[in-house]
Amino acid sequence: MNGPTDSRASTISLLLGVWALFLGFALLQVGTGLQRILLPLRGELEGIGAGAMGVIMAVHFAGYLVGAKVIPVALISVGHIRVFAALASTGSTAVLVNAVLVTTPSWSLVYFVSGLCNAGVFVILESWLNDRATNETRGSILGAYMVVMMGGTAGGQLLMNLGSADGLEMFVLSSVLISLAVVPVTLSASTSPPLPSTEKMPLRELYRTVPSAVVGIVFCSFVAAAASSMAAVFGTTSGMGAGRITLFTSAAVVGAVLLQVPLGSLSDRYPRRAVIFGVSSISCGLAVIGALTPSSNIALIGVNLVFGAFVFPLYGQFVALANDWVPPGKRVATASTLVLASSCGAMAAPLTIGFTMESFGPSAYFWTLAIILGLLALYLAYRTRVRQPIPVERQTRFQPVAARSGELAHSVGKWVMHPLAGWHSRRDDHECEVDERHPSHWTRPSDGSS
């Protein structure tokens, strides 16, 4: 087994080999991060209410769901690089169309296309990185990928301080950044990976196997989608200025990076469901604090930073919880099914938040999130009473995963997680069986294969 020094050297070597992919992805995230805060600000100037913006954001997440399903078909036909170029070009065009056609129906349609393109890009890059990574470097590579994604998004939102939403300049800047993302990727010397076929894991079967993970994915995706898409709408309806809004929205994204690895490591050492219950309860309390803090108070930015630090890692922990219980041969199919559940929660969030803010005022943003997180904590407490957790030594290793619908559908590529042996190739899936009476106990087949 390689030591820590060899593992670090392998990670650095691999990062240098895929620097073009990370650069292209960073440019794309900065451009889309700017677009994400630009639309609510422009919508406020155009008289588009919180309810209408909620519809637009919900349609955007519907695009994520569709993109995660249709883009792999295009990948099989023409390959990763061509599909990436097509998606980035289409996404760049969509930003400019939003600047010209300022109506709720047109924004909904165009933002649906943007969601489809974003989901496709995530599928491409994550499968590419997983194909290049090894057992020893995968966690570090995906962690670096997550930092680039969150950092790019926060950087794009902060760019809003350079201009205003009432002109074309910021729309053009967003479009240019997304277009530039094509350059390093198309010139990359990295070999495009193949996309393997996946097994089936119906949502009903996954729910019967590990209901806590399915319900948790829906709830935490609701909260994460609200925090990423409706935070700017909360800022505009609360009377914040553009500068304050950019700080408020980017604070949650920055916070998302801070506790991903520490909370994941904690859930590896202790019963995962108990850790998730604690994180959900703390997040609920932070949402209540946010609801009680006046929007004019600068401390609300700090509250949102800590809130993001606890909320966003929940998605990855629920993914790990699902992997604790499903058979090794269904890891990839489970990932796709979790995307479906995640998309349902993500699409419901903007609609619900938009309606509650229009009906009860801006503070309903945090109150709604507090209710959702409180219900999640209560459900986890109930599940703890009816089903014993898996022993800590049999839990799968946590991997940093961003809470974004569409990003995980094919992210594990040809690799799956075995709870005892770690990451291994899908070619070896037939070598492991599951004792259906005890889903947490993985056994060797009786035919003597090894």
Identify the meaning behind each predicted range:
Residues F112-V147:
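Cytoplasmic helix-loop-helix junction between adjacent transmembrane helices
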Residues G120-A133, F312-V326:
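Intracellular juxtamembrane helix-capping segments at the cytosolic ends
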Residues T11-F61, S212-G216, A225-S238:
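Helix-loop boundary and gating motifs at the non-cytosolic
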Residues M160-N161, S175-L195, L376-T384:
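C-terminal membrane-cytosol helix-exit motif in multi-pass small-molecule transporters
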Residues M1-S13, P193-M201, R383-S450:
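Intrinsic disorder in cytosolic terminal tails and internal cytosolic loops
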Residues A50-G51, N135-Y145, A242-G243, V326-L338:
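Loop-to-transmembrane helix entry/capping segments in MFS-fold secondary transporters
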Residues R82-L96, S175, A274-V288, A370:
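Structural signature of the two symmetry-related core transmembrane helices
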Residues G67-G79, S164, L259-P271, M357-E358:
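Helix-to-loop junctions at the C-terminal end of transmembrane segments
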